[in-house]
């Protein structure tokens, strides 16, 4: 009987712990959705056109936050993130210092929009609004860099 006990304990432990092994996969942060992006965009070829897309999505996000529309805010933020991730491919041919400034500002802006996203998911509308104002400041900085080109 003693030889079966370790095997029985190991099997019991494996069965008890196996749900924990996948607990972190596609988790929803208690917001009712997972944070894997399901939004697909086609990034414009030119950086100036990409900037116009960013501005349009920012306006959609602002309107969604004002209306307290979580699904619209989520979708706009996801599209903003996708456009921001497309920037490095558009800046690859630029001078190193210019590329570094634009790409760095895009990363900072992505973090700011992520703050808006999480605040709106939590229905913390004051925080979402203040995070959106930070993002607007980042948009102005990025616009200034792009306008120099």
Spans of features found by a protein language model:
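Short, solvent-exposed, charged loop/turn and helix-capping segments
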Residues: 83-103
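Bacterial N-terminal signal peptides that target proteins for export
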Residues: 1-13
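Short, charged, amphipathic alpha-helical segments
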Residues: 73-78, 99-107, 126-137
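Alpha-helical coiled-coil oligomerization motifs
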Residues: 66, 92-95, 99, 121, ...
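C-terminal amphipathic alpha-helix
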Residues: 37-48, 59-60, 112-149
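Amphipathic, well-ordered alpha-helical segments in soluble domains
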Residues: 50-53, 57, 79, 83-86, ...
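Immediate post-signal-peptide N-terminus of mature secreted/exported proteins
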Residues: 24-76, 148-149
């Amino acid at each position: 009987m003693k030889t079966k006990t370790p095997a029985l304990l190991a099997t019991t432990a494996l069965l008890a712990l196996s749900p924990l092994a996948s607990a972190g996969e596609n988790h929803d942060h208690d917001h009712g959705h997972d944070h894997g992006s399901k939004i697909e965009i086609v990034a414009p070829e030119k950086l100036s056109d990409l900037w116009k897309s960013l501005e349009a999505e920012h306006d959609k996000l602002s309107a969604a936050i004002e209306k307290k529309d979580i699904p619209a805010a989520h979708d706009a933020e996801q599209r903003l993130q996708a456009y921001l991730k497309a920037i490095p491919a558009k800046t690859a041919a630029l001078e190193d210092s210019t590329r570094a400034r634009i790409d760095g500002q895009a990363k900072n802006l992505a973090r700011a929009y992520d703050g808006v996203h999480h605040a709106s998911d939590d229905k913390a509308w004051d925080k979402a609004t203040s995070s959106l104002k930070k993002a607007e400041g980042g948009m102005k900085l990025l616009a200034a860099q792009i306008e120099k080109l």
